[in-house]
Every structure is written in C-alpha cells, then in structure tokens.
Design a protein with these regions (language model features):
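Active-site segments that bind and position negatively charged phosphate/pyrophosphate groups
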Residues: 1-23, 111-169
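Amphipathic alpha-helical interface segments
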Residues: 11-15, 29-124, 154-158, 172-237
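Flexible coil/linker segments and helix-coil junctions enriched in charged and small residues
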Residues: 25-27
Length: 237
C-alpha cells in the first residue's frame, strides 16, 4: 500500500527484540521499543523527508504496473545504485546507533506500557517476546500517526503464521490473499483511512498519552474488527 517503508518495520522489530532481551520488565521493554522507534522514524525522515514507500520509490506497488516499473528501474540503475539500497546503506549506521543507545538506557517509570500494537499481538496469540517486538508500531509507528500499528501487527502475524506452517519454504512475492482480505475489511471499518492520526482523530505525544487513550477503550473497536477479520487459513497464498 506504500504507507510505510519496510526498512522502518524491520528496524522497529529489531529494537523491540533488543528491548525484550535487555530488560526483565515487559512494561519497561515496551516503552523502550516505542521510544526507540520514535527516534528511528525521526532519523529516517531526516534522510528522506518521508516514511512512505510510494513517495520514496515514486511508484505504487499494489498494482502490476508499479511493480514492473520498480523492477525495471532497479535493473537499469543496478541494485547498488537504486535509491532504496542507497538509503539503506546511508541510514543503517544511524539506525544501529539509535538501537544501541536506547538499549543501554532505562525507562522505568517513564510511562504506562499499554499500547495498541502489543495489545493486538496478544489478542492474536503472540508470545510476550513478540508482543514487545511489535510495540514500536504503536500510535502509527513510534507514535508518529502514520499507518495503523494494530493493522501492521496483524499483517506481520499473518506472515509469521505462514512461515511457521511452511518451514523451509519461501513466501510468495507481492500477492497475499489473507492480507488483501484484512485490508478490505479494515478500510470498510475506518472509511478508507489507514493512518493512525486519521483513525484516532489525534496524534500522541508520549507513550503515556497513548496508553491512557487505549486503556480507556480507544481503538478497541478497531482491534476487535481486525481479530474478527484475520484469516490465517488463507495465509499468504
């Protein structure tokens, strides 16, 4: 859908995993993951001015023409010279530094750890480790108000379930019926909106503010709708 860059998803999951490994306190680890992802997103925007895939690549990858255009451009320029790979090379040192710095900090007492992403993961049967890993998706990726964190978690869980059910196999590229079905139901629920800021009608400025919103029932209808419409049986193919 082009809402977010996959590099940021990967980085958010990585700092979430590191937070879980570093802290014996799940609440502290979740806050650490959210704050680290917020900083990762700021750093990423310093390099690109946007976190949206379609704005970085200049193509819409949810259709065949967009995919072909991206692949042809990559082959002509050479993958080492493509904007995405150049971005990865330039941004990775900053991302690693941010991850290392946050891993050494303590966030005890920083704020309540309750968040939409971890709550969605738990409702879908995730382990505590997985729930912490995805915490950075909260509030539209590090509280930035972008693509819905709960939806991101559900898509990740679909992929995770497929991998576990197909050990040693490579997932299909670009065509995911279960994800398409979920996206369709999600858009119907939100009136077409995918961004957290539009769905919630506000932007969160701290983990505590987000936690208060979620604990008071904010987005509960969204989480419920996602769980009702997720289809593991369809998988990715």
């Amino acid at each position: 859908q082009g809402q977010q860059c996959g590099m940021l998803w990967g980085a958010a999951l990585a700092v979430g995993r590191e937070a879980y490994n570093r802290s014996n306190d799940v609440a502290e680890a979740q806050v650490m993951a959210i704050l680290a992802t917020e900083e990762l997103t700021r750093s990423f925007e310093d390099h690109t001015r946007t976190i949206q895939c379609r704005e970085i690549t200049g193509v819409r990858m949810n259709n065949l023409f967009g995919l072909l255009k991206f692949m042809v451009e990559s082959m002509i320029a050479g993958f080492d010279n493509h904007r995405c790979f150049i971005l990865a090379e330039n941004w990775t040192p900053d991302a690693v530094k941010i991850g290392q710095e946050f891993a050494q900090e303590t966030t005890k007492g920083e704020a309540p750890a309750y968040n939409c992403a971890s709550e969605m993961a738990r409702r879908l049967g995730a382990t505590e480790r997985e729930a912490v890993m995805v915490a950075g998706f909260a509030g539209g990726l590090g509280l930035r108000g972008k693509g819905c964190g709960a939806l991101a978690v559900a898509i990740w869980m679909i992929a995770l379930q497929w991998i576990r059910s197909h050990p040693g196999e490579h997932p299909p590229m670009f065509r995911y019926p279960a994800v398409s079905k979920l996206l369709s139901a999600f858009r119907k629920k939100t009136g077409g909106a995918l961004a957290c800021e539009k769905i919630c009608g506000k932007k969160f400025h701290s983990p505590g503010q987000h936690a208060e919103f979620i604990s008071q029932g904010g987005c509960n209808d969204i989480l419920t709708a996602i769980k009702q419409n997720i289809d593991y049986k369809s998988g990715l193919n």
